[in-house]
């Protein structure tokens, strides 16, 4: 009997040429993305998938509109997350953060060019909005040695020619994060360098419909991973072996299993190591009848950041009264502040009208009471009143913005910290809390 097979091996044999998000149903594709595990969990949760092509067009239009509105010739991006936003392509993202070998130029007419690692120009070819792939933006000393200035001149000349053709007569160029020789070379070409980060942060602040669908999916995947981490912690803590790193490793593993990418921080601490906050997770063996607090800072499926925080009580005894009070105070803080969120409210109003933490928690409170979120922690930042800078954030909230609402309840000299954080979408008439993960009932005083 003859058996016939399609030349392309499918990721999901039950589907046609594309998966539910419009990406190729090809086992050997270049494009990264969610795994079948994630898709199955999202199907069970009845989540709508994003249309990735539509999401990419929305982002491209947002950036282009912001460039045109400022009268700029173009936007030159070196930051790997700005490049991800513009092109939806990745290449050694963490290595790229300290070895900036990639660049993307978005011209005022929408023409977009990618400079990539010389051996991997194919990594953005799946996106038709990227019109050209080139190499030569690696303007750092490790790669260029004492001739980095020569490489910078060649690169800057390419930028000049592209903008001559696609933004004739315009000489103001927005640049986000550029190496010193790159900056000098661009200025030598006659460009007036403008703040590209101001452009990208504001463009990224409002999410389109498919970005919101992607965030819902990413948030679900993150919360499933957090549940796996909690189950592990509750079953293992007290065995005399399990340490903070063992617990944190579960979140990493479960994130990657669902197509997630990395975690920005190491913010999990147990017992007295949770105070002061910002101690990174380490080899401390976790004990029963202690608090474990963490902040996900997780870049997950579709490159979307899910930034939520929780504190758990793990043990057979009841938590102390001061722990329960701190937890309840933190929940009140984020819930009260969340109620202020709606389109049109000015960011300074949020600062001025914040729920006030008890005096004993003021010194060690979190660095902000809210911040934007998308591909990572993003603009805007909502400061506490004593840290607010007049004129820094005089902008209204808009529908489609997503914010993380924070609480750190931590007394100086104490032996624990409560860390809480929910991720919220600004809707047309208010807000929607995207975070479904429950608060620990023992710390809430209901167990």
Swiss-Prot record:
Residues 1-26 are annotated as: Disordered. Its cofactor is a divalent metal cation. Its EC number is 4.4.1.3. GO terms for molecular function: dimethylpropiothetin dethiomethylase activity; hydrolase activity; metal ion binding. Keywords: Hydrolase, Iron, Lyase, Metal-binding. Homodimer. This is Dimethylsulfoniopropionate lyase DddP. It comes from Roseobacter denitrificans (strain ATCC 33942 / OCh 114) (Erythrobacter sp. (strain OCh 114)).
């Amino acid at each position: 009997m003859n058996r016939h097979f399609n030349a392309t091996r499918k990721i999901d044999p039950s589907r046609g040429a594309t998966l539910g998000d419009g990406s190729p149903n090809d086992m050997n594709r270049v494009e990264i993305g969610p795994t079948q595990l994630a898709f199955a969990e999202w199907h069970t949760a009845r989540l709508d998938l994003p249309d990735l092509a539509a999401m990419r067009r929305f982002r491209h239009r947002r950036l282009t509109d912001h460039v045109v509105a400022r009268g700029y010739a173009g936007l030159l991006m070196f930051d790997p997350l700005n490049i991800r936003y513009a092109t939806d392509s990745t290449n050694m993202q963490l290595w790229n953060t300290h070895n900036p070998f990639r660049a993307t130029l978005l011209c005022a007419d929408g023409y977009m060019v990618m400079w990539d690692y010389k051996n991997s120009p194919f990594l953005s070819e799946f996106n038709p909005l990227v019109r050209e792939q080139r190499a030569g933006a690696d303007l750092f000393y490790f790669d260029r040695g004492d001739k980095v200035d020569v490489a910078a001149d060649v690169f800057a000349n390419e930028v000049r020619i592209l903008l001559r053709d696609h933004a004739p007569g315009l000489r103001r160029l927005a640049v986000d994060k550029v190496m010193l020789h790159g900056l000098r070379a661009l200025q030598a070409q006659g460009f007036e360098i403008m703040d590209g980060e101001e452009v990208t942060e504001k463009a990224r602040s409002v999410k389109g419909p498919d970005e919101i669908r992607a965030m819902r999916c990413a948030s679900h995947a993150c919360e499933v991973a957090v549940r796996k981490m909690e189950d592990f912690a509750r079953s293992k803590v007290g065995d005399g072996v399990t340490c903070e790193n063992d617990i944190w490793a579960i979140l990493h593993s479960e994130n990657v299993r669902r197509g997630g990418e990395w975690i920005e921080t190491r913010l999990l601490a147990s017992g007295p190591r949770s105070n002061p906050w910002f101690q990174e997770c380490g080899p401390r063996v976790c004990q029963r009848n202690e608090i474990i607090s963490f902040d996900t800072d997780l870049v997950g499926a579709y490159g979307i950041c899910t930034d939520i925080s929780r504190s758990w009580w793990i043990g057979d005894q009841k938590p102390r009264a001061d722990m329960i009070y701190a937890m309840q105070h933190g929940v009140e803080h984020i819930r009260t502040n969340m109620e202020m969120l709606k389109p049109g409210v000015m960011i300074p109003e949020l600062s001025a009208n914040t729920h006030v933490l008890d005096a004993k928690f003021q010194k060690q409170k979190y660095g902000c009471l809210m911040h934007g979120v998308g591909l990572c922690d993003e603009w805007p930042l909502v400061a506490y009143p004593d840290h607010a800078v007049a004129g820094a954030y005089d902008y209204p909230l808009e529908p489609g913005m997503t914010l993380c609402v924070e609480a750190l309840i931590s007394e100086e000299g104490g032996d624990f910290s409560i860390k809480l954080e929910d991720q919220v979408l600004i809707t047309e008439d208010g807000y929607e809390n995207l975070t479904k993960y429950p608060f620990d009932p023992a710390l809430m005083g209901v167990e």
